[in-house]
Amino acid sequence: RFKKIRRLGALPGLTSKRPRSGSDLKNQLRSGKRSQYRIRLEEKQKLRFHYGLTERQLLKYVHIAGKAKGSTGQILLQLLEMRLDNILFRLGMASTIPGARQLVNHRHILVNGRIVDIPSYRCKPRDIITTKNKQRSKALIQNFIASSPHQEELPNHLTIDPFQYKGLVNQIIDSKWIGLKINELLVVEYYSRQTDL
């Protein structure tokens, strides 16, 4: 993880650790020597590691975004941001996306009153996300919410009630609230050169 953030910059979904202040400057100095391919590859890797996706999963999302109306890059980011594991992370109900994925896999999370154990579940506006009514589930979420560093930065498409361990999806995310510094067009470009998008 440290190597990844040193090379790619802050990846809040993967870890709360941040690169040392000098490493950004080193990366910029090195970027003068980087090829266009390498720049596109690094943006793609940044996206993949932040959201914790396999190469195949990310490629699938790029294909879905490519078939939808609108900007492929913007739609790609919306698809990734509306995943259940990411929504839990953005709500502060988990400290990282891998941590959120574990909560979902272990059946601690309900969407609209039903257990959902698929981290890639695509959340929709008006979805209500709660924790199972069990002491262990509530204790896990309570710890995450209490120690969450990004509570005050909650994006405007989400609302949380920390006392009821309940999150609400208000709308599809607006691109300015994406939780990662990324040039999504370079990611789309990377894949369009690799495949027939």
Swiss-Prot record:
Predominant subcellular localization, coarse grouping: plastid
Cellular compartments per GO CC: chloroplast; small ribosomal subunit
One Pfam assignment: Ribosomal_S4
GO MF annotations in UniProt: rRNA binding; structural constituent of ribosome
Origin superkingdom: Eukaryota
Residues of the S4 RNA-binding domain: 82-143
Alphabetical GO biological process terms: ribosomal small subunit biogenesis; translation
InterPro entries: Ribosomal_uS4 (IPR022801), Ribosomal_uS4_bac-type (IPR005709), Ribosomal_uS4_CS (IPR018079), Ribosomal_uS4_N (IPR001912), S4_RNA-bd (IPR002942), S4_RNA-bd_sf (IPR036986)
Subcellular localization(s) per the UniProt record: Plastid, Chloroplast
Protein family according to the UniProt entry: Belongs to the universal ribosomal protein uS4 family.
Subunit structure: Part of the 30S ribosomal subunit. Contacts protein S5. The interaction surface between S4 and S5 is involved in control of translational fidelity.
Annotated function: One of the primary rRNA binding proteins, it binds directly to 16S rRNA where it nucleates assembly of the body of the 30S subunit.
Protein name, UniProt field: Small ribosomal subunit protein uS4c
Organism in which the protein naturally occurs: Gladiolus papilio (Goldblotch gladiolus)
